[in-house]
Amino acid sequence: MKNFYKYLVAIFLITVIALPVQKVNAGNKDRAGQAGADELLINPWARSSGWGGANVSCIRGIEGIFNNVAGLAHTPKTEIVFSYADWMRGADIRLMSFGLSQRVGESGVFGFSFMSLNFGEIDITTIDLPDGGIGKFSPRYLNVNISYAKAFSNSIFGGLNVKVISESISDASASGIAFDAGIQYITGELENIKFGISLRNVGIGKMKFSGDGYSLQTMVPNNNNQFTTTQRGASFEIPTQLNIGAGYDFLFDGSRFTLAGAFISNSFKKDQFSLGGEFSFKEYVQLRASYTYEEGITKPITDPTRTNAERGFAGGLTVQVPLKKESKSVFAVDYSFRPMENFSSVHTIGVRFTL
């Protein structure tokens, strides 16, 4: 088991070191907006999104699939999560997610989740009919994750995730495959010192749109023959991300306060620093808040150095009740709040069953 863990760490570190070879320049602000599939950077979950990314070292359960899949290994037995958000309320963008994790054996956990973005209905326009009136179409994004995490000891946890990415409109679509990997390490006499590292969205090749939308039918000049031309869509990379974090649990009589922070290295946007805390009262009520900083985030939205609509703050609340006193089964309602600049804030609500 120890040798297996050493090999896992070695492979993980080699992957991190090899990123420059793949031309992934972390924290390069000049590359902002040049990647696709940016929905991979949106946390869809109601509980963990209140942390703002600071909880890479202490995330637990199915929501760990988002920023550190190693957290999946802490699933007691079975966990089911539903979440919903109006992304930038008023823009008619609906964000829905579902996750299911199941412990297998003494130390392994399988996980499955998906996130769907629905942009509502948009008028179809053409060159001849720029004002529409000929119908509507609905863009859709869908990300599906299949994960496995394992507890290698009482202190060491690791996980891998495979994600399938799909983006589509009525006459064009793009798809891709990416991988995540993560490790968590817990130490201290009370197991209250935590470290975590995760590598997210390592794509296999690039994504590219294709379909009938890239074809154009026209007439040959001075001829009655019709011909079709097909354009080639430009390929694009997905936003790889490296997260490194640490956390500490302050334990009181029946309560807990967790302080955690993380450095978030982005391949197609500015690097970020996230700090957050969570207070848990007897595991029945949990309050959390965080702040994620990046260069220019405090400047007006019209400033050219600002490239993020989020204000950096996030917060959340969880209320959970036990289903069985003799087990860890709980039913919980999670909520998070993320304010935006010049857009309506994002409110996410979810329900969670731990069986």
Give each language-model segment a name.
Residues M1-V9:
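Bacterial N-terminal signal peptides that target proteins for export
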Residues T15-V24:
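C-terminal segment of classical bacterial N-terminal signal peptides
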Residues K23-L355:
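Subset of outer-membrane beta-barrel
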